Every structure is written in C-alpha cells, then in structure tokens.
Swiss-Prot record:
Stated family: Belongs to the LipB family.
EC number: 2.3.1.181
SUPFAM superfamilies per record: Class II aaRS and biotin synthetases
Domain BPL/LPL catalytic: 31-206
Organism field: Marinomonas sp. (strain MWYL1)
Protein name (record): Octanoyltransferase
Length: 214
C-alpha cells in the first residue's frame, strides 16, 4: 500500500501540548499509518535536549525552560521561527537516523536556495549555516523505529534570546535568520517551500498542506 505524506499547518501552538501529541502519535501509530510533518511556530521558550548541560543556560530570565527528550542541547523557539516536526517510519523508508539528518539539512539548504540564500550543513555540528552563522537547528528522537521532533528554521524572528544561552552548546555561536539575508522573505512561502523539499527528499510527492490537527 502506497501512502501519501500528511503535512499539517498548525499555526502558533503551545510546546508542551505539541510534544505530548508527538509522543502519542509515535506510540500508537501502526506500520500502515501515513508519515506526517507538522509545520508550526511556538511561543517563546528554551528547550533543553537530552545532552543538555546547565552551564549552557546563561541567563534564561523570564523565558521558560523545558527539558525534553530530543537529542542535542539547548535552543530557543519563538514567533517567526518555522518548526517542522518530522514523524516518519524509518524502517519503511529504508533509512537510518543519519540519513534522516541529511534529509532535514538538505531540505533546508534547498529551501534557502529558493530564497537566494546560500547555506550548508557541517559534518561535525548538525544544523544549517550561512557564513558560519547558524540558521537552522536539528534535534530528533526515534522510538519504535519512528522519528519525532525535527528542525527549527529561523525565518523572521527576534534573535536576542539566543544571547541568553550557548546555542546548541556552542559558546559564542552566532545565529541568523532569513529576513536579515533576504528582506523579501515571507514565512508562509517558506513553509510551503520547506514542506515540498522535505517531501521530495523523503521520496514523496509534494503534499497538500492541511490546516489544523484534523
């Protein structure tokens, strides 16, 4: 049975609720359930991954910090950052975790190229970079052979909260967003571009984007 990729546009949603829905989706899905990508933004918060160290939280202040079950260290989420949660059956796709990381990175690089931004991944530091500045962060978890969590692409956002942490555990790492590199960037366009690139890299047709959870 050939399955389509389901892609959902969820708008701005609470992190804790979305995290719980991801875990539930992954726990109960069967081998016959379609893979899904959730596109969304979160209100301001820091998330600390499984490898996270307290010393990289420099001065969180009034921004909440949530300890989560993804890989990686601390990062910031906020309005104007496009988050893509990628829930795919790795075994069914015939790929491993490292392959999925490459899919996410290559999808971001291609979406950025469509906006006249030249970017690249780094083999020793997952994510996507422009002139040594980080524009997209990755963090994944695999359970029962299926992935959840995903990537965060800085589109048009306030980057100052990143100064309160060592992003992804790297002291002095500079962050950048698309708007600073291309004034014509529109988040809704980037959303569709990223969805299409993710689908193509995963071997799917371009998806119709559904609004909301259902």
């Amino acid at each position: 049975m050939e399955l389509d990729l389901i892609c959902r546009d969820l708008g701005v949603v609470d992190y804790a609720e979305t995290w719980e829905r991801m875990k539930q989706f992954t726990q109960i899905r069967s081998k016959d359930d379609a893979d899904e990508i959730w596109l969304l933004e979160h209100p301001s918060l820091f998330t600390q991954g499984q490898a996270g160290k307290e010393e990289h939280l420099l001065a969180p202040g009034d921004i909440p910090v949530i300890q989560v079950d993804r890989g990686g260290q601390v990062t910031y989420h906020g309005p104007g950052q496009l988050v893509a949660y990628v829930m795919v059956d790795l075994k069914r796709l015939g790929i491993g975790v490292r392959d999925l990381v490459s899919v996410l990175e290559n999808s971001v690089v291609r979406a950025l190229a469509l906006n006249a931004i030249e970017a690249y991944p780094k083999p020793d530091a997952p994510g996507v970079y422009v002139d040594e500045q980080k524009i997209a962060s990755l963090g994944l978890r695999v359970r029962r052979g299926c992935s959840f969590h995903g990537l965060a692409l800085n589109v048009d956002m306030d980057l100052t909260p990143f100064n309160r942490i060592n992003p992804c555990g790297y002291q002095g790492l500079q962050m950048v967003d698309m708007k600073r590199l291309n004034k014509g960037v529109i988040l809704s366009n980037v959303k569709a571009q990223l969805a299409n690139q993710l689908a193509e890299q995963l071997g799917y047709n371009y998806p119709a984007i559904q609004q909301g959870w259902k």
